[in-house]
Amino acid sequence: ERMKTRVKELRTAANMTQQQLAELVHVSSRTIISIEKEQYNPSLLLAYRIAKVFDTSVEELYCLEENLELDEKQYRELQTDVGKGEQ
């Protein structure tokens, strides 16, 4: 399973380079590049370290694609339900 990641989004928002993030979490910049391209799923320890850098949770940083699709479906259903209730 592939995990969707917000690493690049959070890193760029923090004006941080891939090299800077790599140094903070004790990996190579190539590892960060692979994570951002979603070519590599990090270990739980590395995911935790990255989340800690951005003061967020592992759950906020990563989600499985299937969970993302489910969340989007649930969101659309909720919008439909709310729309019906407002009429």
Regions found by a protein language model. Name each.
Residues 15-34:
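Short alpha-helical DNA-recognition segment
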